[in-house]
């Protein structure tokens, strides 16, 4: 394993070529790299953004987050327990952007994402953005390390606090005009 020579590195992150999705591998408690799925990434991001904004006293009482209907319901639990409004919208970042547009000037956007490894962490961007997400992820890793946690341990802590979930992804392909009509 070439990663053994990287010393203290306990996470790897990358984006796809058009920089709109982020992937993460973290070391588990055995020191092995494991992939973090899209739902887990959104949980880590949104939990951090809500928690950190509270810690820094940046909340005005009108904050909200957005997830899509295909994204884990654990996000709803995290939002409710932290006193944040959560919007659940159709799949796709255009729908997250629509929620942002509807709340512009009225509420404070904290973050949004979906299980497809996309995340939107700034209100001045209206599509998934891996560049900003990579920066926030580095910030999350440093914040976790300050607490004596790896990202893997942070994820486990989130599960313990908000509940474990099981998921299974299914991909269905529909072809042609009849397929489009079925969708």
Map each language-model feature to its residues.
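Single conserved hydrophobic/aromatic residue that forms the stacking wall/gate
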Residues: 1-10
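Short Gly/Thr/Asp-enriched flexible loops that form oxyanion-binding sites at enzyme active sites
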Residues: 20-38, 75
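Short glycine-rich anion-binding loops that position phosphate/pyrophosphate groups of nucleotides
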Residues: 16-20, 116-118
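Phosphate-binding and adjacent anionic-ligand microenvironments
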Residues: 32, 52, 57-183
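Glycine-rich phosphate-binding loops that contact phosphosugars or nucleotide phosphates
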Residues: 8, 17, 78
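Catalytic or ion-translocation cores adjacent to nucleophile or general acid/base/metal-coordination motifs
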Residues: 37-50
